[in-house]
């Protein structure tokens, strides 16, 4: 009996290193197996404050609730082609009689929207914290409701093309979810637009 037990123990002892090696090899293979790749497509929504660069009269507003929808396709791990749709809330202006007579504008309301196309360059600053730099071109639509001193009211729509630049930070909350803060600037002289916003994005 003792010989049988001894042989059994010896067999187990001989097989144990091989079993441990196989287990270790399996665990190593699982560790080295890459995570399933995403499609490299992301989309998000932000809300915040929009600012109009507006040489307006004696009583005017330049800020309004605004926001943007955005999405992109990664070209490399740190570079993506991106499109944004930005909407800027309505602001208004009222001129004093003297200025109204000079400009032929008694009061005015305006709002704007823009579609931008450009690139999003990402640089990881810290673990899960990424810096975003954006550059592109914007197609801007402006809508104005103008009240003339005579009492007439007219609506005017116009389109302009202008450069778009932006910067921001994002924090990766989970693997495919980020929260972000962004600054966007549509560079168009006295018609420039600014957007300060926060929001989130998902990657697919």
Predicted regions and their residues:
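Cleavable N-terminal export/targeting peptides
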Residues: 1-39
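Short glycine/proline- and aromatic-enriched beta-strand/turn motifs that initiate or cap beta-hairpins
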Residues: 25-81, 85-87, 115, 121-124, ...
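Residues that define the transmembrane beta-barrel architecture of outer-membrane proteins
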Residues: 39, 61-67, 111-115, 159-165, ...
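Outer-membrane beta-barrel "beta-signal"
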Residues: 42, 171, 192-204
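Gram-negative outer-membrane beta-barrel proteins
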Residues: 51-57, 89-95, 139-147, 187-191
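Solvent-exposed loop/turn segments connecting transmembrane beta-strands
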Residues: 55-61, 125-127, 159, 186-195
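Extracellular loop and loop/strand-boundary signature of outer-membrane beta-barrel proteins
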Residues: 55-58, 101-108, 149-156, 183-186
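Transmembrane beta-barrel domains of outer membrane proteins
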Residues: 71-72, 120-122, 168-170, 184, ...
């Amino acid at each position: 009996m003792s010989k049988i037990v001894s042989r059994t123990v010896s067999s187990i002892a001989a097989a144990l290193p091989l079993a441990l090696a196989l287990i270790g090899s399996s665990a190593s293979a699982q560790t080295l197996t890459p995570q399933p790749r995403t499609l490299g497509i992301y989309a998000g929504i932000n809300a915040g404050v929009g600012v109009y660069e507006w040489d307006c009269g004696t009583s005017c507003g330049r800020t309004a609730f605004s926001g943007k929808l955005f999405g992109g396709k990664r070209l490399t791990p740190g570079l993506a082609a991106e499109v944004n749709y930005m909407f800027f809330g309505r602001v208004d202006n009222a001129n004093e009689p003297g200025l109204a007579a000079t400009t032929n504008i008694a009061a005015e309301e305006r709002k704007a929207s823009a579609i931008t196309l450009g690139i999003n360059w990402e640089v990881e600053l810290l673990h899960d914290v990424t810096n975003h730099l954006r550059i592109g071109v914007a197609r801007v639509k402006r809508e104005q409701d103008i009240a003339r001193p005579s009492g007439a009211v007219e609506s005017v729509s116009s389109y302009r093309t202008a450069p778009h630049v932006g910067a921001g930070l994002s924090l990766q909350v989970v693997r495919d979810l980020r929260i972000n803060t962004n600054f966007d600037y549509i560079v168009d002289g006295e018609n420039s637009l600014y957007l300060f916003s926060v929001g989130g994005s998902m990657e697919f």
